Amino acid sequence: MGREFELKFSATEAQQDAIRAKFGDFTEITMATTYYDTPDHALAARHITLRQRLENGQPVCTVKTPHADGGRGEWELQWENPATMVEALCNIGAPVELLVLTAGGIIPVCGARFTRLAKAITLEGGTAELALDRGILMGGNRQIPLCEVEVELKSGADEATISFARSLAVEFELIPQHQSKFRRAQKLAEEN
């Protein structure tokens, strides 16, 4: 199992531009994400996120599960067919409970379309990815703008990532964002 640990912040385009100016070159990735759940929302009820994302056109399927330490369990693989992605993810170690939960099928529930500017940051005691995401979240017939900054631990200790993210938040006056893209897009679908 992979473990995801990240801190997210709401940002303005001007704040993102200032961060980009400070840190130099970023890699640009076009993201088109569809989030899936069961018709009775069994995954969301258990705080499980299931998605297929096209990253510069390449299909990547991911499942994220709650983790006791505040991070999330994460399994990911390149996979084109959403109908068979749960089985494929379980084959690489995702909880087999997912097969039972999704036995009745999965449906698309919401999505996101955005551009990610990503950069690896070397920290004392580890590395992190600094990501600037700008685009839209979609649910039902509604959409809202997306503009956020993510700092994700890639290796090393949580503390180094937390320290870097906090200093970034102070310097650029960023506001913590405690809800995932999925949860915010899901709310749009529910309000429709």
Question: Which residues make up each language-model segment?
Answer:
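Phosphate-end processing signature that detects enzymes handling 5′-triphosphorylated RNA
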Residues: 1-192
